[in-house]
């Protein structure tokens, strides 16, 4: 019984670890992070990790060199009629 509990705990920890490392837009929609490179407003600091960036409520995308990788998301507009 103890071995089963141990393995369930290991699986749970691995699942939590892998889910946090794959998401670049934790708590944000992909649309909010679709900021053109020229319009990115820096939200981080040199050598910020994706996790640190996301913890600040910012987007992380390191695919374009020479622009901020950690940047402020777009504000989603609310539709009012």
Swiss-Prot record:
GO molecular function: identical protein binding
Localization per record: Secreted, Extracellular space, Extracellular matrix; Cytoplasm
Gene Ontology CC: one annotated term: secretory granule
Disulfide bonds: 33-59, 43-58, 53-70
Source organism, top-level taxon: Eukaryota
Ranges for domain P-type: 31-74
SMART domains tied to this protein: PD (SM00018)
One Pfam family cited in the UniProt record for this chain: Trefoil
Biological process according to GO: maintenance of gastrointestinal epithelium; regulation of glucose metabolic process
Signal peptide: 1-23
Matches recorded under PROSITE patterns: P_TREFOIL_1, P_TREFOIL_2
Sorted UniProt keywords: Cytoplasm, Disulfide bond, Extracellular matrix, Secreted, Signal
Quaternary context: Monomer. Homodimer; disulfide-linked.
Job of this protein: Involved in the maintenance and repair of the intestinal mucosa. Promotes the mobility of epithelial cells in healing processes (motogen).
Protein name (database record): Trefoil factor 3
Natural source organism: Bos taurus (Bovine)
């Amino acid at each position: 019984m103890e071995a089963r509990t141990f393995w369930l705990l290991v699986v749970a920890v691995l699942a939590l670890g892998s889910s946090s490392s794959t998401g670049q837009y934790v708590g944000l929609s992909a649309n909010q992070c679709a900021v053109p490179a020229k319009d990115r407003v820096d939200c981080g600091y040199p050598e910020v990790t994706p996790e640190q960036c996301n913890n600040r409520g910012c987007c992380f995308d390191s695919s374009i060199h020479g622009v901020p990788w950690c940047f402020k998301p777009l504000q989603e507009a609310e539709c009012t009629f």
